[in-house]
């Protein structure tokens, strides 16, 4: 990044690097902190070795994420870096962290990342800083500086922050606060800015995207938002974290009628059995799962369906698990993520009886993965012999183009790997769309040949 503030050019300032753990919501926070520091004249990047201040933006959703965050904190403090801990762990353990890890120089909560420059200035003066609000309330809009890596051609656009649901297994409402939506004008403005920077795909995110607008408009307003975003000149707009309750006829119609909103439905259903869903404090969902999935497939035959599931939830027995397997066979999702229940202190599920033994939960996870691999392979093989549109994101050492069609989301799904007969300079492909013929498919990826650039 370049320094924007010429007034600080001659000052001795910190070189700040970022280490990021966790979800894309955390990534957006990191990008805003980078943008804010850049505006203040700091040298900002990802080169830990060259930096004297390292901001570790942490995740605290499950134990493994906390362990990874702690490892990074220890690694960087051992290197003599001034470490500032931001994000969900700072919010979760705002009192304990500074006591148990006195080598940490500062904390920045999930609703306080806009204060990062002030925090670093105080750390530079030798202060130990705890900048963590009790209840996160802030959400950045398009006016808050943000560094977006244009080399990736994909950007996440946060439409709301926080969550008002109280799912039994989830700590996020305590870490991210209540839902607070941005207004439609703000979101559209940022989308236009991203499109002007050459972003080819915008992914809408929040804790529950289908609840967007409930807090500011008095009712869920995703359909209104999508109607306005469909006018933005960006090839692909993708929606993550859509819950069944918010997939109204109007929302589904927005997918169907738009040219740039891809028919990709990310539905974190977690389970299928009514008893388990009730224990998860999602009793409303069981009656909707079947009807919503059928409705999507009927109205949008080209729809791609992804879900995430939890196995080993307290009280889940073989009957419940078999119900889930039957559900998967019946609906044949294109993509499935499966996780083993992680008991998190501070959630209502933490004290639930009838814990599932770890070896049983592991076996159930493996069972689902095996079943889904067969389904995904069958689904992918339907593309063999067809022509598809692919966004090229990188080039392999073998001069193969690697990208995605609309049915693959970045990071979590597969890739499309393409050979090309007359290879030219990579700048002719990266960040551009090509038309490709698919020749082969496995359970994860598609393989084919480039027909032409688009």
Curated annotation (Swiss-Prot):
- MTTase N-terminal domain location, by residue? 14-125
* Keyword S-adenosyl-L-methionine attached: yes
Which Gene3D superfamilies does this chain map to? Methylthiotransferase, N-terminal domain, Nucleic acid-binding proteins, tm_1862 like domain
Q: Which GO terms describe its biological process?
A: tRNA modification
Q: What is its main location?
A: cytoplasm
Q: Which InterPro entries match?
A: Elp3/MiaA/NifB-like_rSAM (IPR006638), Methylthiotransferase (IPR005839), Methylthiotransferase_CS (IPR020612), Methylthiotransferase_N (IPR013848), Methylthiotransferase_N_sf (IPR038135), NA-bd_OB-fold (IPR012340), Ribosomal_uS12_MeSTrfase_RimO (IPR005840), rSAM (IPR007197)
Q: Where is the TRAM domain?
A: 381-452
Presence of keyword 4Fe-4S: yes
Q: Which reaction does it catalyse?
A: L-aspartate(89)-[ribosomal protein uS12]-hydrogen + (sulfur carrier)-SH + AH2 + 2 S-adenosyl-L-methionine = 3-methylsulfanyl-L-aspartate(89)-[ribosomal protein uS12]-hydrogen + (sulfur carrier)-H + 5'-deoxyadenosine + L-methionine + A + S-adenosyl-L-homocysteine + 2 H(+)
UniProtKB keywords: 4Fe-4S, Cytoplasm, Iron, Iron-sulfur, Metal-binding, S-adenosyl-L-methionine, Transferase
Q: EC no.?
A: 2.8.4.4
Location in the cell reads:
Cytoplasm
Kindly list the positions annotated as binding [4Fe-4S] cluster 2. 163, 167, 170
Residues that, per the record, bind [4Fe-4S] cluster 1: 23, 59, 88
Top EC group: transferase
List, in alphabetical order, the Gene Ontology terms for molecular function in this entry. 4 iron, 4 sulfur cluster binding; aspartic acid methylthiotransferase activity; metal ion binding; protein methylthiotransferase activity
Question: Cofactor note, please?
Answer: Binds 2 [4Fe-4S] clusters. One cluster is coordinated with 3 cysteines and an exchangeable S-adenosyl-L-methionine.
Which cofactors is this protein said to need? [4Fe-4S] cluster
Q: Which GO terms describe its cellular component?
A: cytosol
Xref: HAMAP family: MTTase_RimO (MF_01865)
Per the record, the similarity remark reads: Belongs to the methylthiotransferase family. RimO subfamily.
Q: What is this protein called?
A: Ribosomal protein uS12 methylthiotransferase RimO
Please name the source species.
Prochlorococcus marinus subsp. pastoris (strain CCMP1986 / NIES-2087 / MED4)
Gene that encodes the chain: rimO
